[in-house]
Amino acid sequence: MSAIVLDGKAYAKQLEGEMQERVERIRAKTNGEPPILATILVGSDPASATYVRMKGNACRRVGMDSLSVTLPEETTTEELLAKIDELNADERVRGILLQHPVPKQIDERACFDRISIDKDVDGVTTHGFGRMAMDEPAYGSATPAGIMRLLRHYQIPLEGKEAVVVGRSPILGKPMAMMLLAANATVTICHSRTKNLPDVIRRADIIVGALGKPEFIKGDWIRDGAVVVDAGYHPGGVGDIELSAVIGRCAAYTPVPGGVGPMTIATLIAQTVEAAEKAAGI
């Protein structure tokens, strides 16, 4: 069986080209002012700093501006909330991203929820998640929304399919399940206390690995002809799924790296562009 490679890197590059054109139209209506994506990094975690740089580079590639806000490790919840309020009030800023995780003394949920829903381009607020769950307009959490874009691009059938999401985090597993449900898939969410996990996964037409444990999902748990989406990334270039054991048997799969990761950033940029278009009346 020759599997379809769900190439997120290639599709993200295509999306960036489309975003460039849309940003040009926005700037034509705003006297040349580019939309701004503001990213907030609290502390100096090297991985988080790398992600922030990658997002800034993506902004510049499509003609947007990136505002990088770095706060000290000892920042309090109140100080971070004040900074978010400042960015909410700045009409030049069309998207706000608070880099996860924040230091333990900060109430992360309160800070996420302080972001204006119109600028919640990373889909992290409870208001936005609730609207999405009720089929109302909202920006989706960037990683699952990126996965959905990738599946649609490659015309992977979802309606009536049995989908299993392994992981239930509020920014990945849960919104992923809601998006698949909205696409008329029949969805099962699995987690650390799921009984007979291999048997549940063997039923799946579509498997999404979203639990953050390297190669936790074994190849022999996955049936022939399944669509395999791996949202994990760990040292050594492996994800949450033992991909090497299924590439020859599955219908389609996301490579690690180069599958889900590039789509997360591309979706964040696309949702910021959409927010800027709404603000510009386009």
From Swiss-Prot:
Record keywords: Amino-acid biosynthesis, Histidine biosynthesis, Hydrolase, Methionine biosynthesis, Multifunctional enzyme, NADP, One-carbon metabolism, Oxidoreductase, Purine biosynthesis
**Which pathway or pathways does this protein act in?**
One-carbon metabolism; tetrahydrofolate interconversion
Q: Which gene encodes it?
A: folD
> Record keywords: Amino-acid biosynthesis included?
yes
Respond yes or no to whether keyword Membrane is given for this record: no
Name recorded for this polypeptide: Bifunctional protein FolD
Question: Reaction(s) catalyzed by this protein?
Answer: (6R)-5,10-methylene-5,6,7,8-tetrahydrofolate + NADP(+) = (6R)-5,10-methenyltetrahydrofolate + NADPH; (6R)-5,10-methenyltetrahydrofolate + H2O = (6R)-10-formyltetrahydrofolate + H(+)
What does this protein's UniProt record list under function? Answer: Catalyzes the oxidation of 5,10-methylenetetrahydrofolate to 5,10-methenyltetrahydrofolate and then the hydrolysis of 5,10-methenyltetrahydrofolate to 10-formyltetrahydrofolate.
Q: Which InterPro entries match?
A: Aminoacid_DH-like_N_sf, NAD(P)-bd_dom_sf, THF_DH/CycHdrlase, THF_DH/CycHdrlase_cat_dom, THF_DH/CycHdrlase_CS, THF_DH/CycHdrlase_NAD-bd_dom
Subunit info?
A: Homodimer.
EC no. given is 1.5.1.5, 3.5.4.9
